[in-house]
Amino acid sequence: MVVPELQAANFGGDYDNFTYPRYALDFALVRVYEHGKPIQSPYNLKWKTKGSVPREPVFVAGFPGSTNRLNTYSQFVFNRDIFYPFMLRRINSMLMTARRYSERGPEQSRRALDDILNDENAKKSLIGEYKGLMDKTIETKCRQNENELRQRIASDPELAGLHGNAWETIDRVVQKQAVIFKEYTATFSTPLADIAFSIIRYALEKESISPTSAGTDKSADKKTPEKPLAADKTVKKELLEELRAQSLSPTAIALDYEEVRLAGELEFLLSELSAGDPFVRSMLGEGSILRAPADVARDAIRGTHLTDIAFRKTLLDGGRKAIERSTDPMIVFMRKLVPLWLEREEYHRNNIQAPLAVALEKIALARFAVYGKSAYPDANFSLRLSVGTVQGYSMNGTLAPSQTTLYGLFDRALSFATSDVASDFILPARLAANREAPQRDRIPLATPVNFVTTCDIVGGNSGSPLINRNLEFVGLVFDGNIESLSGRFVYNEEAGRTLCVHPTFIIEALRKLYNAGNTADELEGIKSIPLAPETKPSDSKPSEKNLDKVPEKRSGTVDEAKPPRNMVRAP
């Protein structure tokens, strides 16, 4: 229904991302239809335009993605010394590739914008989390918590017999994980590479269900993997549907950008792995020499027909035999790599993930036996309710207020107007024009824009409603401040804050910027939901595309449900 323009939702760009004070109109409204009519549900939150007041108790209801607060100390060290440094190098490489491509011209800049916003967001998030790992106070707390639990278990013979060896198991597995980490993460992702992988995987899984339906060409490439990844038939059927949908997705693909991205991915992996690594040899090897990543990417992209959905369908319908006989350069290229991917994933699943899961379950059971419900579990995308208060905090030797206003937004725009980064702080066009409107149609400069609470959130909470004790909607969660990023490992109530869009700003924008007064009336309960749509949902095309800051999507906290492209979350 309503989506603000990018400059309104992303005001301040990467400079203001994960910061506060903040001035973002970051929201989206959609209407849910049932049987062709707007759904009329009795289950809803009453909208409170005035929002909340300082020190008022508030609650965030949402699905936080994941945290690592209950990790063992050896896992903490692995993340600090291996995982995060590697992922930061990787995101820097991805960001550099996208930026270089965007400098080629306006159209290239447009194509790369989503990836740049995504990667900038991911990088800033990773840096904030990494700083938490480097914080000696957090490290000490992690070690102390583990020692206390182990002592409590050791003092109970029954618990010690059931769970006492779990830490030693994790220590051994993490040491093994550190050795193979780079090899396991030797993957890459581009639109065409993903399509090729899905097509090849589809053929393998389909044949594993009906061995006689595809057949194999004995003279074909013997490197096509024999083992499918999924074992359960029900899982396989669901996987087949997903792989086929991914393979036939009508995604727009710019071949020149695809080539640059693939070359960048291969270049990074070459820099991280040894020249003799089997994956590197399969990617770049030609006899006894290694080809340049740019040359390999060029040959794989420029002759491919995978941009043609009909061609993809032919490969899917042809099964494994069609894959093995295909001369399409991208299929040939990926056909060499899929066996190694599946082999390494199987090894990791059996030798890292499985023993870790068993040992961590033992520790979780022991923790519950010792602490009961007083120690809540790590975030895992399940529904959680976080309580806090609307409250400012100390920062940079001064105080951050609990809320910002439109005065501050205009001041920030004017303050950067003549700087080198002015483009990130340009006033959104509609908001600038609103200052010239008749007085009654202007948004008052004292209008609250964003505000902060002490609620405990992590990636995945973006878009969660903020409610008060009366179950009234008083804000929309869209980000956390930079101090909150260490919350992946420990909650920081002193300075970690949840950032929310104020409901007053949303209502004022609907009425005075977007000509959506009827929608504002619905939210405020002034009028009821229409019984029939004014226009079909699929017919509406926003005049301006709202590109969220991160993958694939949002502004603010990294969305765990859809992590940044080709990123792996901390183990």
What are these regions (language model features)?
Residues 1-571:
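Terminal presequence/propeptide segments associated with secretion/organelle targeting
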